[in-house]
């Protein structure tokens, strides 16, 4: 194989490698975004549950007749 053809093949490999890296980075960013959204959703649910339990506790602690 002559040197120009070898250079061209190397450029193609580098281009494919660049595209693969970009795809991996994009997939990683999407995963992080999805995980972050799931964490926020879970946090919201847990906060609501905690508030409900606190309200129930307050009701139980009030003396009857109030």
Swiss-Prot record:
What are the TM regions of this chain, as residue ranges? Answer: none
Impact of changing residue 43 to A on the protein? Decreased VASH1 tyrosine carboxypeptidase activity on alpha-tubulin
Question: Keywords for this entry?
Answer: Coiled coil, Cytoplasm, Cytoskeleton, Disease variant, Intellectual disability, Secreted
Coiled-coil annotated spans: 5-52
What GO CC annotations are associated with the protein? apical part of cell; cytoplasm; cytoskeleton; extracellular region
The segment annotated Disordered runs over: 1-31
Q: What is the effect of changing residue 34 to E?
A: No effect on VASH1 tyrosine carboxypeptidase activity on alpha-tubulin
Q: Where is the composition biased (Basic and acidic residues)?
A: 1-23
Per its UniProt record, what PANTHER family does this chain match? SMALL VASOHIBIN-BINDING PROTEIN
Kindly state the subunit structure of this protein: Interacts with VASH1 and VASH2.
- Family, per entry: Belongs to the SVBP family.
Q: Which disease is it linked to?
A: Neurodevelopmental disorder with ataxia, hypotonia, and microcephaly: An autosomal recessive neurodevelopmental disorder characterized by intellectual disability, microcephaly, ataxia, and muscular hypotonia.
Q: What is this protein called?
A: Small vasohibin-binding protein
Biological source species: Homo sapiens
